[in-house]
From Swiss-Prot:
Organism ancestry: Eukaryota, Fungi, Fungi incertae sedis, Microsporidia, Unikaryonidae
Primary location recorded for the protein, binned into one broad class: cytoplasm
One Gene Ontology term of the molecular function aspect: structural constituent of ribosome
Subcellular locations according to the entry: Cytoplasm
Descriptive protein name: Small ribosomal subunit protein uS11
Organism: Encephalitozoon cuniculi (strain GB-M1) (Microsporidian parasite)
Chain's gene name: RPS14
Keyword rRNA processing: no
Length: 134
């Protein structure tokens, strides 16, 4: 009888916050206390209007992938976050691109989870008594 012993693979958590204005790719250890790498889309492009684009998210994810592969991380658990609260719950345009880029870099996917904050009671919207005058 042969026993197959799996090698211990280092796992990490990828916290991806994708809004319409920017995409954050933040890699921590499993507890979330130690940051391994943190890069935003705005750090990789020059024009401010391009910070939230899928291209900026791809560049940020490529840089993060090279850093964490150098540290020996093989498995990633994804936690995706949109703006949430009073703002839109939908993820920004860079979320899918960031995930796809990290997978193409050779990292395995553990689990994907949506952690967008949801307001249980509606937070009072801006505008005051007479409403927001546009």
């Amino acid at each position: 009888m042969t026993e197959q012993i799996e090698s211990m693979e280092l796992a990490a958590v990828a916290h991806i916050k994708a809004t319409k204005n920017d995409t954050f790719v933040h890699i921590t250890d499993m507890t979330g206390s130690e940051t391994i790498a943190k890069i935003t889309g705005g750090m990789r492009v020059k024009a401010q209007r391009d910070e939230g684009s899928p291209y900026a998210a791809m560049l940020a994810a490529q840089d993060v992938a090279t850093k964490i592969l150098g540290r020996g991380v093989k498995v990633l658990h994804f936690k995706l976050r949109g703006a949430g609260g009073v703002k839109p719950m939908a993820l920004g345009p860079g979320a899918q691109t960031a995930i796809r880029t990290l997978i193409r870099a050779g990292l395995r996917v553990g689990r994907i989870e949506d952690v967008t904050p949801v307001a249980r009671d509606r937070v009072r919207k801006r505008g005051g008594h007479r409403g927001r005058r546009v």
